[in-house]
């Protein structure tokens, strides 16, 4: 090889090995690249911008409840395609696909357990299951959870994450709004606390029923909360909505919710509130310091 060929020859570049999948995550708000193990330790909250990423319903209960003495409620309930509904796809096929991808039987998970030693029932919507939509099984499982609360005289905590009622079940889905509201009315008559925790997003029939019937309403930061979406409202009223409209901070400022709590502080906050609401003796829960 001549001297000119040596100069013009392309240098050998060692190809970098591919990064294994599942090692890194990207914040959907600020674009920060986060080591997945660090993200899990921060409960899926971005360590740079504090953006609260969406989590599954089961993960939310695992984060919230104490590890021991947990009992799942309504595991035998299965959705049925009574109407034989079909849009671009058969409803029964949508159910099967959602069950396969999430590992859940429907969009609500309910468990009896404790948080910092305080007994309760906690339910959580899974937005990954058909948008967390409320259907017959969701309503039935929520009512079962309320009945367990009534039987054992313990409070109920609900984590909402839903697009609203499930259109494939039509009127039967809308009936769950009344059904769940009636169950909460029974709890209220018995003086049992219900804390509603609004996460991103809480919309439609869920926001118009059980999600806004709490004794206390807590939201995660910047959660989208409302009935119709902002784009639909703007198209209907033909006006530009205020900045931050339907976000948790906007609702807090206008008195629609009681407080906004970081996910990493949720266990402490709820345990302390429940201890006060039930006049429990001095426990670990009552000693937690919460910024109010």
UniProtKB/Swiss-Prot annotation:
UniProt-annotated location(s): Cytoplasm
Pfam families linked to this entry: Carboxyl_trans (PF01039), Zn_ribbon_ACC (PF17848)
Molecular function per GO: acetyl-CoA carboxylase activity; ATP binding; carboxyl- or carbamoyltransferase activity; zinc ion binding
GO CC term, one of those recorded: acetate CoA-transferase complex
TM stretches of this protein: none
Cofactor: Zn(2+)
GO biological process, one term: fatty acid biosynthetic process
Enzyme class name: transferase
UniProt keyword annotation of Cytoplasm present: yes
UniProt keyword Endoplasmic reticulum, yes or no: no
Zinc finger (C4-type): 27-49
UniProt entry keywords in alphabetical sequence: ATP-binding, Cytoplasm, Fatty acid biosynthesis, Fatty acid metabolism, Lipid biosynthesis, Lipid metabolism, Metal-binding, Nucleotide-binding, Transferase, Zinc, Zinc-finger
Primary residence: cytoplasm
Pathway where this protein functions: Lipid metabolism; malonyl-CoA biosynthesis; malonyl-CoA from acetyl-CoA: step 1/1
UniProt cross-references to HAMAP family, sorted A to Z: AcetylCoA_CT_beta
Protein name stated in the entry: Acetyl-coenzyme A carboxylase carboxyl transferase subunit beta
């Amino acid at each position: 090889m001549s001297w000119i060929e040596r100069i013009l020859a392309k240098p050998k570049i060692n190809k970098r090995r591919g990064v294994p999948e599942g090692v890194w995550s990207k914040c959907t708000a600020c674009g920060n690249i986060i080591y997945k193990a660090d993200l899990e330790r921060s409960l899926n909250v971005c360590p740079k911008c504090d953006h609260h990423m969406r989590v599954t319903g089961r993960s939310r209960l695992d984060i919230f409840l104490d590890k021991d003495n947990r009992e799942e409620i309504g595991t035998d309930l299965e959705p049925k395609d009574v109407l034989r509904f079909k849009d671009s796809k058969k409803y029964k096929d949508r159910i099967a696909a959602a069950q396969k991808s999430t590992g859940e039987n429907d969009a609500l998970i309910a468990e009896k357990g404790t948080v910092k030693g305080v007994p309760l029932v906690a339910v959580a919507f899974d937005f990954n299951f058909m948008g967390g939509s409320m259907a017959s099984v969701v309503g039935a499982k929520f009512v079962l959870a309320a009945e367990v609360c009534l039987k054992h005289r313990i409070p109920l905590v609900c984590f909402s994450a839903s697009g609203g009622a499930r259109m494939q079940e039509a009127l039967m889905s809308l009936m769950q709004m009344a059904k769940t509201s009636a169950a909460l009315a029974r709890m209220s008559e018995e003086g049992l606390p219900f804390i509603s925790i609004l996460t991103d997003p809480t919309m439609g029939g869920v926001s118009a029923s059980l999600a806004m019937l709490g004794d206390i309403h807590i939201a995660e930061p910047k959660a989208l909360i409302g009935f119709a979406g902002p784009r639909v409202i703007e198209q209907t009223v033909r006006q530009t909505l205020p900045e931050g409209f339907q976000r948790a901070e906007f609702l807090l400022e206008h008195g629609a919710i009681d407080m906004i709590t970081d996910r990493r502080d949720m266990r402490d906050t709820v345990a302390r509130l429940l201890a006060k609401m039930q006049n429990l003796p001095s426990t670990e829960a009552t000693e937690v310091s919460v910024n109010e």
